[in-house]
Amino acid sequence: MCRIFIVLLVVAALAIIIEGQLTFSSGWGNGKRSISSEQINDDCNPEEAIFQIYKLIVSEGERIRACQRDGKM
């Protein structure tokens, strides 16, 4: 009896998942999270982004060293 209940429960869960996948529509066009041509910024390149991240890491490292030197950590 318990095995039949578990099988029916699994089948019901799968039916819900499958029904959700069948009703999904990909034909909605551009949603609110898509990038429009007006929002694209070609001025930013990957090298600049990496350099900004590097500068952030260096500045945080300097702050940590200063705190360790002053005995605050």
Curated annotation (Swiss-Prot):
One of its GO terms (molecular function) is hormone activity. It comes from the Eukaryota. The modification Asparagine amide is found at residue 30. The keyword NADP does not apply. The modification Pyrrolidone carboxylic acid is found at residue 21. GO terms for cellular component: extracellular region. InterPro entries: Adipokinetic_hormone_CS, AKH/RPCH_hormone. Coiled coil: none annotated. Residues 1-20 form the signal peptide. One of its GO terms (biological process) is neuropeptide signaling pathway. Keywords: Amidation, Cleavage on pair of basic residues, Hormone, Neuropeptide, Pyrrolidone carboxylic acid, Secreted, Signal. Pfam families: Adipokin_hormo (PF06377). Residues 34-73 form a propeptide. It is found in: Secreted. Expressed in corpora cardiaca (CC), corpora allata (CA) and gnathal ganglion (GNG) (at protein level). Expression in CC and CA detected in all animals, expression in GNG detected in few animals (at protein level). Not expressed in antennal lobe (AL) (at protein level). Belongs to the AKH/HRTH/RPCH family. This hormone, released from cells in the corpora cardiaca, causes release of diglycerides from the fat body and stimulation of muscles to use these diglycerides as an energy source during energy-demanding processes. This is Adipokinetic prohormone type 2. It comes from Agrotis ipsilon. The lineage of its organism: Eukaryota, Metazoa, Ecdysozoa, Arthropoda, Hexapoda.
